[in-house]
Regions:
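Cyclic nucleotide-binding regulatory module and flanking cytosolic helices
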Residues: 1-34, 38-39, 83-84, 88-91, ...
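Polybasic "coupling" helices that flank or enter modular domains
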Residues: 121-189
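Short, small/polar residue-rich loop motifs at catalytic or cofactor-binding pockets
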Residues: 29-30, 48-50
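Phosphate-/nucleic-acid-contacting segments
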Residues: 162-231
């Protein structure tokens, strides 16, 4: 059965904990823009200014991050993404860190930044939810620094991928030259080649021309055990 607008809003991270009356007030005062998309349609582009909140209410999203020096491209499949980079609505860098498009037909709900500031931030629950979203992002970044106490080459590769990922869930596709990856993680090309082949032998990733694919990086990280370093 199709969800009502109240039910859809209550599922969104920013509105969790609101009463039916509070949701009704949001709908009465805040303009909600709905847009339908086809598979392959782009939602926002990397570097584009974040001018509001964009919620994914239907469909599967793909995110693409391109290094500013064109050394690599990371594509993530994000079937459970609910909102696109709400933490970049404020702060010093108010632009999207990557491009987002639909891998299927989809639908978004957008709320302009002016509406967020004027109406939504006046609600204490919404302000707390926004703080939680921002704090969670910061804490994820901090935890990454302590993920592997003693970095082997394989661990450096995993940390590199996670450092540029939105989520630990979903498939990650990396387009990168072996020499570029070696330079980024401060290893030799030979060490990187050996490490990638070991990871493939263990079923953690699949090597392909110009890069590799990891189907489940969360499982890969959780299952990872230290290997003998090839330094």
């Amino acid at each position: 059965m199709e969800l009502t607008m109240f039910e859809r809003l209550l599922q969104l991270p920013l509105f969790q904990g609101l009463t039916t009356r509070e949701i009704a007030e949001v709908m009465a005062h805040v303009r909600l823009d709905f847009v339908n998309y086809h598979s392959g349609d782009e939602i926002v582009m990397q570097g584009e200014r974040c001018q509001g909140l964009i919620y994914i209410i239907q469909g599967e999203v793909v995110a693409e991050f391109r290094d500013t020096d064109n050394r690599f491209c990371l594509t993530e499949h994000l079937p459970h993404l609910k909102v696109i980079e709400p933490y970049n609505l404020f702060g010093m860098y108010q632009t999207y860190s990557r491009s987002y498009s639909f891998a299927s037909s989809g639908r978004t709900l957008s709320i302009d930044k002016a509406m967020v500031l004027r109406y939504l931030m006046a609600n204490d629950i919404i302000k707390i939810n926004m703080m939680n979203i921002t704090c969670n992002k910061y804490q994820q970044t901090q935890r990454l620094l302590c993920l592997f106490p003693d970095d082997t080459v394989q661990q450096k590769i995993l940390k590199f991928i996670l450092a540029h990922s939105i989520s630990r869930k979903g498939t990650k596709e990396i387009q990168i030259k072996m020499t570029a990856l070696a330079h980024i993680i401060h290893e030799t090309r030979l060490n990187v080649s050996i490490a990638l082949n070991q990871l493939q032998e263990l079923g953690f990733l699949t090597l392909q021309r110009g890069g590799f694919v990891i189907k489940n990086i969360q499982q890969t990280t959780d299952s990872f055990t230290p290997f003998t370093s090839h330094k």
